[in-house]
Amino acid sequence: MAKTSMKVKQQRAPKFSTRAYTRCTICGRPHSVLRKYGICRICFRELAYKGQIPGVKKASW
């Protein structure tokens, strides 16, 4: 889990635009965030298995 201080820090506008980064809206994880959904791969996987993300289904080929 991300530190509360880092979550608050990320909400502020960055001094320089290149310092902005995405963070998972559920757990606050800064890496591997899917832009389309705004959540990290771990949270995405959990929600997809539960069927809570519309239009997402398990791939099989």
Curated annotation (Swiss-Prot):
<keyword id="KW-0479">Metal-binding</keyword>
<dbReference type="GO" id="GO:0003735">
    <property type="term" value="F:structural constituent of ribosome"/>
</dbReference>
<keyword id="KW-0687">Ribonucleoprotein</keyword>
<dbReference type="Pfam" id="PF00253">
    <property type="entry name" value="Ribosomal_S14"/>
</dbReference>
<keyword id="KW-0689">Ribosomal protein</keyword>
<feature type="binding site">
    <location>
        <position position="27"/>
    </location>
    <ligand>
        <name>Zn(2+)</name>
    </ligand>
</feature>
<dbReference type="InterPro" id="IPR043140">
    <property type="entry name" value="Ribosomal_uS14_sf"/>
</dbReference>
<protein>
    <recommendedName>
        <fullName>Small ribosomal subunit protein uS14</fullName>
    </recommendedName>
</protein>
<dbReference type="GO" id="GO:0019843">
    <property type="term" value="F:rRNA binding"/>
</dbReference>
<comment type="function">
    <text>Binds 16S rRNA, required for the assembly of 30S particles and may also be responsible for determining the conformation of the 16S rRNA at the A site.</text>
</comment>
<dbReference type="InterPro" id="IPR001209">
    <property type="entry name" value="Ribosomal_uS14"/>
</dbReference>
<feature type="binding site">
    <location>
        <position position="24"/>
    </location>
    <ligand>
        <name>Zn(2+)</name>
    </ligand>
</feature>
<dbReference type="GO" id="GO:0006412">
    <property type="term" value="P:translation"/>
</dbReference>
<feature type="binding site">
    <location>
        <position position="40"/>
    </location>
    <ligand>
        <name>Zn(2+)</name>
    </ligand>
</feature>
<dbReference type="GO" id="GO:0005737">
    <property type="term" value="C:cytoplasm"/>
</dbReference>
<keyword id="KW-0694">RNA-binding</keyword>
<keyword id="KW-0862">Zinc</keyword>
<comment type="similarity">
    <text>Belongs to the universal ribosomal protein uS14 family. Zinc-binding uS14 subfamily.</text>
</comment>
<dbReference type="GO" id="GO:0008270">
    <property type="term" value="F:zinc ion binding"/>
</dbReference>
<dbReference type="GO" id="GO:0015935">
    <property type="term" value="C:small ribosomal subunit"/>
</dbReference>
<keyword id="KW-0699">rRNA-binding</keyword>
<comment type="subunit">
    <text>Part of the 30S ribosomal subunit. Contacts proteins S3 and S10.</text>
</comment>
<feature type="binding site">
    <location>
        <position position="43"/>
    </location>
    <ligand>
        <name>Zn(2+)</name>
    </ligand>
</feature>
<dbReference type="InterPro" id="IPR023053">
    <property type="entry name" value="Ribosomal_uS14_bact"/>
</dbReference>
